[in-house]
């Protein structure tokens, strides 16, 4: 595909930014497993977490680990989750506390509390934990993935959830008037619709989504597919909220770097992390994103669940960690301005403002093509720009290029870049810059199967 975009056409194709981000800072972070399993080196995790510029963490205090004997609530401080909560709170971060999972003494073989006794038991547990985390937890999330077990994805089951919610929310608010209430995490769009039909919006301050696509199979497990899912979920939410958006937190999302049918290489995990971070702020209803999870759960290459982490079990950073560390400032503090239309839905150029600079985040979703773009700077004085791939060191480039492959004369006001899957970031004064040319050419990223080593 080859086409030239004129100055007039390019201006017409600029999409306006979405206003109204709200006063709350965007929350970017990851999930931990300190609350129940106490897994990981807390200090090593938190040091790397803070160095990456993350400001949100999520963990749980499961019911059965608080009410050890029926009727006896005891908050055993294991020293892990408490240090995480205190450090996060001390740095102005956001802690999301999960209240979750059935207690065998109340629920028997059921996976959810349904009887009056079980609901009252859950309410006592929830208000107790809320009191213990008062002033430090920004959110109490009532349950994690209610819809994840057989039979719990139905409308009837979600009505059971809203019944529990109606009972427990007043108790939580009484225990900590400042805390906000977050819904259980919807894992698929039809499950989200059942949750909304059941009346969840009457009781919560924010919705939680777990929009995983990593399990959907090749071609449907990409960030491009995730973005389409998020757009559908937004439309569903508006359908049940009088046409208006509702605050959403993506409290789990990730791709496992594992040797499994639904696994990915560490390089692909990093690429998807970068595409995810660069595009999430184009969805104004999303107020926060937490990667699942910060640390690998184990050293088991053939187990997907053990390999979602940004760091290994011994705290060695993975490539995706460096992507998070590099892009965290842009995601947290940047202002999304517009998406620059390229004429190709698989070629993305996003315009941000960050600390007085313009930032372009640019990549393509084509699995087997390169895209060359040409930018022209019409300013009288053209300052150098910073250029880097996400997670990599930046280089400085002066404006001016010669298209020697076509034997064209030098253009003092132009720069050309090749876009592939890893986002390329251009930073500087781009106020008079426009896209003047885009060309996509075949360029496979992998060897044919019959030629792979």
Locations of regions flagged by a protein language model:
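Noncatalytic carbohydrate-binding groove/subsite architecture in carbohydrate-active enzymes
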Residues: 157-276, 280-285
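Carbohydrate-binding surface patches
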Residues: 342-390
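Conserved, mostly hydrophobic/aromatic
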Residues: 57, 129, 140, 168, ...
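Aromatic/acidic polysaccharide-binding cleft in carbohydrate-active enzymes
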Residues: 255-325, 339-345
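Boundary/entry segment of secreted carbohydrate-active catalytic domains
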Residues: 22-62
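C-terminal beta-strand-rich structural cap/linker in extracellular carbohydrate-active enzymes
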Residues: 401-453
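Substrate-binding cleft and catalytic face of glycoside hydrolase catalytic domains
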Residues: 52-214
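Bacterial N-terminal signal peptides that target proteins for export
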Residues: 1-9
């Amino acid at each position: 595909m080859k086409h030239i975009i004129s100055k007039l056409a390019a201006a017409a194709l600029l999409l306006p930014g979405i206003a109204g981000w709200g006063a709350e800072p965007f929350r970017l972070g990851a999930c931990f497993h300190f609350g129940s399993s106490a897994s990981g080196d807390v200090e090593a995790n938190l040091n790397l977490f803070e160095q990456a510029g993350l400001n949100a963490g999520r963990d749980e205090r499961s019911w059965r680990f608080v009410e050890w004997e029926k009727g006896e609530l005891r908050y055993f401080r294991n020293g892990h989750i408490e240090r995480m909560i205190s450090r996060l709170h001390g740095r102005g971060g956001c802690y999301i506390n999960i209240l979750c999972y059935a207690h065998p003494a109340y629920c028997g073989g059921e996976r959810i509390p349904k009887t009056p006794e079980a609901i009252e038991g859950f309410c006592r547990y929830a208000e107790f934990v809320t009191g213990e985390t008062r002033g430090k937890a920004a959110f109490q999330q009532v349950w994690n993935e209610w819809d994840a077990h057989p039979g719990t994805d139905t409308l009837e089951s979600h009505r059971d959830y809203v019944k529990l919610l109606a009972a427990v929310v007043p108790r939580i608010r009484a225990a900590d008037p400042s805390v906000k209430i977050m819904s259980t995490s919807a894992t698929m769009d039809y499950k989200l619709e059942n949750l909304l039909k059941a009346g969840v919006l009457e009781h919560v301050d924010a919705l939680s989504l777990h929009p995983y696509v990593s399990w959907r199979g090749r071609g449907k497990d990409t960030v491009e597919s995730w973005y389409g899912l998020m757009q559908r979920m937004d439309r569903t939410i508006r359908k049940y909220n009088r046409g208006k958006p509702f605050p959403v937190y993506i409290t789990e999302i990730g791709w496992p770097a594992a040797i499994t049918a639904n696994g990915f290489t560490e390089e692909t995990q990093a690429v998807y992390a970068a595409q995810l971070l660069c595009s999430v702020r184009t969805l104004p209803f999303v107020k926060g994103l937490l990667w699942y999870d910060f640390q690998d759960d184990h050293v088991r290459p053939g187990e997907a669940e053990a390999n979602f982490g940004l760091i290994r079990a011994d705290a060695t950073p993975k490539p995706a960690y460096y992507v998070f560390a590099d892009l965290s400032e842009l995601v947290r503090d940047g202002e999304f301005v517009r998406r620059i239309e390229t004429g190709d839905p698989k070629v993305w150029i996003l315009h941000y403002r960050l600390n007085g600079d313009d930032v372009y985040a640019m990549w393509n979703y084509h699995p087997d093509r390169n895209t060359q773009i040409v930018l022209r700077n019409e300013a009288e004085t053209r300052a150098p720009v910073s250029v880097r791939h996400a997670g990599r060191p930046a280089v400085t480039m002066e404006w001016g290029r010669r298209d020697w492959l076509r034997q064209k004369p030098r253009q003092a006001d132009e720069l050309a870049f090749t876009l592939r899957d890893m986002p390329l970031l251009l930073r500087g004064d781009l106020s008079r810059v426009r896209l003047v040319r885009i060309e996509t050419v075949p360029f496979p990223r992998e060897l044919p199967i019959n030629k792979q080593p």
